[in-house]
Amino acid sequence: MVKIKELLAIVKSSVIVMVIVILIVGVIIPTVTSFIAENVDRGSANGSQINLDGKIYGSYLLAQAFNQSYFFQPRPSAINFNQTSSGAPECAPNTNASLNETSQNIKEFERMNPNVTLSQIPGVMIMDSDSGLDPNIPVQGAIIQEKRVVQSIINLGNIKGIRLSLHEVNSTVNQLINSSESQDFPIFGSYYVNVMYLDVGIINFLVNHNILSKSSLD
């Protein structure tokens, strides 16, 4: 039989090992990882927050509803971009309900972009994302919205009594698209842009040109 002293020694060793593992896995590794993340990529470590004039307006990782015509539109959302929730449509893809929903998404996209034909619209632009909060759209999905966005920015400037040149607005929007372009998988992946990045860039442009006031962001 195992003696009491031997049993206590085994228990003591087990406790020591457990404490060491807890310290390493639960304290040291998270602390070191957090320290590295904060110093290497502070923005991502904090959830890629959208910071405008010192205030947080969400995250670049979560799509929001930008209903004005001078903003790029994200993919449709079954949860109405409710950031306290997440989810896709409940209906199966081959049901009448799903077909009707897709048809409505097409009509809405064509209403917002009357110069775009159905064949130009990437399929994902008329399909709800799995989370309902996907901020990424294909590059083509941004390009076909570009004409509407540019003209709407110019029109908004005219309403505010500020004349913007087509060249300046075009260049700004093009630069936003190009600087946001990423590939979801090296070499063979598809190219996409982050709608939140584009629309925050537009907000900054409008604020800098005194077309939108900072107070209107609240």
List each model region and its residues.
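Internal alpha-helical transmembrane segments
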Residues: 5-43
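Extracytoplasmic/periplasmic C-terminal soluble domains
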Residues: 148-218
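Active-site oxyanion-binding pockets that recognize sulfate/phosphate
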Residues: 17-18, 88, 92, 188
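Solvent-exposed aromatic/hydrophobic patches embedded in short alpha-helical segments
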Residues: 23, 27-28, 141, 197-198
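N-terminal leader/signal peptides at the extreme start of proteins
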Residues: 1-2
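Flexible, solvent-exposed loop/hinge segments and secondary-structure transition points
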Residues: 26, 33-145, 149-152, 156-162, ...
